């Protein structure tokens, strides 16, 4: 699908200068496009009506589609020169649409304060950048965290921020005292490796996405060793139960006390499993040079480069991210507010789950425990992740014990996949 979209963009996109209409005085017709569920359609439509009421000169034409149809629809609109003014954008497609000239550069609007992102963390805004400039404004954020069951670890201190050494010491203590295991260091999720190399200033993939973003295989060997050691010593979740842990059934049953998940999964996880959970940051390398955690945009709003009403389009997005009524109508369907002021004002009215999510996101931002998000993953990343999972499984079952040799072999194969995939 991405290759088809890219071809359409390359063949049909002709750059032009937009004649910008005033968002304040002249009659404006603003076209807005998004994807999502029926609930999102209903709430966003209601928000558009509110915007029209507060901006009498603006008439909004809405358009939406399911995710499965959205990108074909958008590519068709590009080829037919019928793009909307405001486009809901996804992180995986941002580079493609920005580099093909479909999206407007928003730097001048941010500099002028017309797109007010002054209360958003720099790392959040950076997620909407391409080639050093902002082309998309995040609608909301989430982050990878360690979720744990406080009922299982009552009486033990679980700090919000831990080094690997501190985390492993806690895991060993909980296993020795209560027989509890964990499924972060023992698991097969490649985000463990991503976070580890980010701690040392690298990214998982290189800039042109033709190889891994680092050359020292010892970084991979370290992660392999964590898996092997945790299983061998018992404090890592038995691999036979790993699949169950992914759906939280094992944390509910008490087989493991901690697992890796996104913050926006808390509501469904607690409700679906009837358990109250807490969240802390993922452990960091003992000698880390930067925080590994990043705020991932739930999705974005972008402005079409060829829009004739860019001022109005920018004002609509600014209204969305900075007006409390947005979230009163739409809730946190598109993620938690990027504005710390809006988030703070809304938090008292949040559900218990949303208050916990807000607390960890706010704390990470306030304490500087995040860094800018990496570029979106290459096409071959799924194959690389599967390959990584194969190696982890063999380590979990004791079929691989020479971690350095296995790491070097994995690196070679991963680079071959990435080079071919490009």
Question: What is the meaning of each model-derived region?
Answer:
Residues 107-120, 177-179, 202-222, 271-272, ...:
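Short, solvent-exposed loop/beta-turn-alpha elements that line the ligand-binding surface or hinge
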């Amino acid at each position: 699908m991405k290759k088809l979209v890219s071809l359409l963009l390359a063949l049909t996109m002709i750059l032009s200068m937009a004649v910008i209409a005033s968002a304040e005085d002249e009659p404006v017709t603003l076209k807005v496009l998004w994807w999502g569920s029926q609930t999102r359609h209903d709430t966003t439509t209601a928000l558009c009506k509110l915007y029209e009421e507060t901006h009498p000169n603006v008439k909004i034409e809405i358009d939406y589609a399911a995710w499965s149809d959205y990108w074909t629809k958008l590519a068709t609109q590009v080829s037919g020169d019928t793009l909307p003014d405001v486009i809901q954008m996804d992180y995986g497609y941002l580079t493609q649409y920005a580099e093909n000239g479909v999206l407007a550069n928003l730097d001048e609007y941010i500099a002028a304060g017309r797109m007010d992102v002054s209360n958003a963390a720099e790392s959040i805004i950076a997620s909407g950048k391409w080639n050093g400039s902002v082309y998309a404004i995040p609608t909301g954020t989430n982050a990878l965290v360690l979720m744990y069951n406080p009922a299982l670890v009552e009486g033990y201190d679980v700090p919000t921020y831990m080094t690997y050494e501190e985390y492993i010491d806690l895991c060993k203590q909980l296993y020795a005292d209560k027989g509890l295991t964990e499924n972060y260091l023992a698991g097969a999720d490649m985000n463990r490796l991503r976070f580890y190399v980010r701690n040392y200033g690298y990214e998982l993939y290189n800039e042109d996405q033709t190889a891994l973003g680092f050359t020292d295989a010892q970084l991979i060997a370290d992660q392999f060793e964590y898996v092997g050691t945790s299983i061998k010593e018992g404090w890592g979740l038995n691999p036979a139960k790993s699949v169950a842990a992914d759906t939280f059934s094992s944390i509910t049953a008490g087989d493991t006390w901690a697992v890796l998940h996104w913050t926006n999964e808390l509501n469904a996880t607690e409700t679906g499993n009837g358990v109250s959970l807490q969240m802390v940051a993922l452990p960091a390398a003992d000698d880390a040079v930067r925080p590994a955690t990043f705020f991932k945009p739930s999705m974005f709003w972008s402005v079409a480069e060829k829009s004739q009403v860019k001022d109005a389009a920018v004002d609509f997005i600014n209204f969305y991210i900075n007006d409390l009524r947005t979230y009163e109508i739409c809730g946190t369907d598109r993620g938690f507010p990027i504005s710390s002021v809006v988030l703070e004002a809304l938090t008292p009215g949040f559900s218990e789950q949303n208050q916990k999510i807000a607390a960890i996101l706010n704390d990470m931002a306030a304490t500087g425990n995040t860094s800018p998000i990496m570029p979106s993953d290459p096409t071959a990343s799924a194959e690389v992740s599967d390959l990584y999972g194969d190696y982890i499984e063999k380590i979990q079952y004791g079929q691989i014990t020479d971690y350095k040799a296995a790491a070097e072999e994995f690196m070679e194969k991963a680079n071959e996949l990435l080079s071919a995939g490009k």
